[in-house]
């Protein structure tokens, strides 16, 4: 029985059963080692004290409380931190991304990220901008504790159905919902990088994994949608982070695509191109029954100085 499920919402009876089974299976010494390795990672967004889970509610010592939703996530994006009623991705873009990614088109990237996490042998991971959870759910299998946070509640609701061993949180990068110095690796895949907050939550010499579009990413798609194609500038992240992080490794992952019409529509809908492109150009492109593209991803692994 997986201990991390307890962090996701076991009741008292479930915990007793888990303890009994674990004692029988691994012995009392190993059991206490496992329990010691697990820790509460979440931080109260109001007073910044540790949150503990009891009876499907996260509480801090100052009695601020946050209920776990029926879908399995907790909302730590407090009202005073919101700038709009429904921040983040739209429901349409979330559903389009879920359909596109679940079809496996970006599987080479998912595999590359998982392999890197496995090689680092880390214990705690925070995925910033987890979205609908495609990458987060896969990374979780390589660590002891995994937290996925996104500002879009509709995305986290979808993510929470994928993997019950992830602690799914609605939250903001401006105040990451985890405690100081408790994370081995922060990941940011196609998401903003709140550098100071990442520095706060990372352990000494912790890692930051950044994934961003490489120069050639979806070039044919952008060429069809826009009169002028502006190149992606992945190197800007190296320049941005060089003061507080050492660049450990950088590499590119290519994913050649042959998209049927439905997948093409999903791809457009899940990107900013959906609202940046002129409607007539988007409609013309979506008439294609098939489209050949190359997805190209730039990956950076940084280490906190």
What are these regions (language model features)?
Residues 35-86:
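N-terminal auxiliary segments of SAM/dcSAM-dependent transferases
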Residues 132-143:
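Conserved SAM-binding loop of SAM-dependent methyltransferases across substrates and taxa
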Residues 121-131:
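Conserved class I S-adenosyl-L-methionine
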Residues 164-176:
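Conserved SAM-binding strand-loop segment of SAM-dependent methyltransferases
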Residues 195-209:
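A short glycine-rich, Lys/Arg-flanked "PGG" loop and its adjoining helix->strand segment in the class I
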Residues 253-305:
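Conserved Class I S-adenosyl-L-methionine
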Residues 174-185:
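A short acidic, Gly/Pro-enriched loop at the edge of an enzyme's catalytic core
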Residues 152-154:
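Conserved SAM/SAH-binding beta-strand->alpha-helix loop
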